[in-house]
Structures are given as structure tokens and as C-alpha cells.
From Swiss-Prot:
Heterooctamer of four alpha and four beta subunits. Its EC number is 4.1.1.11. PANTHER family: ASPARTATE 1-DECARBOXYLASE. One of its GO terms (biological process) is pantothenate biosynthetic process. Pathway: Cofactor biosynthesis; (R)-pantothenate biosynthesis; beta-alanine from L-aspartate: step 1/1. The modification Pyruvic acid (Ser) is found at S25. This is Aspartate 1-decarboxylase. Keywords: Autocatalytic cleavage, Cytoplasm, Decarboxylase, Lyase, Pantothenate biosynthesis, Pyruvate, Schiff base, Zymogen. Catalyzes the pyruvoyl-dependent decarboxylation of aspartate to produce beta-alanine. One of its GO terms (cellular component) is cytosol. It comes from Acinetobacter baylyi (strain ATCC 33305 / BD413 / ADP1). Its cofactor is pyruvate.
Length: 126
């Protein structure tokens, strides 16, 4: 049996473009994609921290070091320039793989440069 686990996420990136009439997808700065391990054309989940909307699309590579996070096509109705988003991917893992799995977590600065990376989410305390 396979378990679906968080593969990676880019946390608190800022939307730089919302292009309704561009072919659908989400363009992501190539440096962020590489650090997170997101492949071009991979399915991504986008969670808009600003407005609470969630949607699924696919990633396209943006220019390295550009800071671009461009929500395109119909998904542009779900985000505005300046919104904070979390971009995540999931993968299916065998039990052995799941036991050893550590997600790739990339934390973004407000200009979409990398603040830091991690491979676990801190324990939430009351």
C-alpha cells in the first residue's frame, strides 16, 4: 500500500503576477523550484494564505533569481498580486520509503528569495 505524503512546499511566497489570459499554470522562480524539488509541469497545490482559496494547477519554470510567482489562466481568479501563498506537491511512497521520507521545505522572504530551508515542520505547541 502506498501513502501520499507532502513531498515539498514553498512557504509564504508572494504572488508577483496574476495573468488571466496567459496559458494556465503557475510560473515559479527556477531557484525556488530547484530547492523545493518541483519539476516543470508537475501538479502543484496552491493555498492562498491571504484569501483562503485553494487550487490545483501545474508548475512552469520562471527565470532563475527573478522572484516570479505568476498565477495564470483561470487560476488567476484565485490570487492577486501581493497575496501570500503556499505551494506544495505530494508523492506516493511505499511504507519503507515513507518511514525514511523528509519533505523539502523552502521558506521565502517577501521578495521571494530564500529565507531558509528545512526538512521537518516544527512541533506546534498550545
Amino acid at each position: 500500500m502506498l501513502s501520499r505524503l507532502l513531498k515539498c512546499k514553498i512557504h509564504r511566497a508572494v504572488v508577483t503576477h496574476a495573468e488571466l489570459h496567459y496559458e494556465g499554470s503557475c510560473a515559479i522562480d527556477g531557484v525556488l523550484m530547484d530547492l523545493a524539488g518541483i519539476r516543470e509541469y508537475e501538479e502543484i497545490h496552491v493555498w492562498n494564505v491571504t484569501n483562503g482559496k485553494r487550487f490545483t494547477t501545474y508548475a512552469i519554470r520562471g527565470e532563475d533569481h527573478s522572484g516570479i510567482i505568476s498565477v495564470n489562466g483561470g487560476a488567476a481568479h484565485q490570487a492577486e498580486v501581493g497575496d501570500l501563498v503556499i505551494i506544495a506537491t505530494f508523492g506516493d511512497f511505499t511504507e519503507v520509503e515513507a518511514n525514511a521520507h523528509k519533505p523539502r521545505l523552502v521558506y521565502a522572504n517577501p521578495d521571494n528569495t530564500v529565507n531558509h530551508t528545512a526538512n521537518c515542520i516544527p512541533v506546534q505547541v498550545a
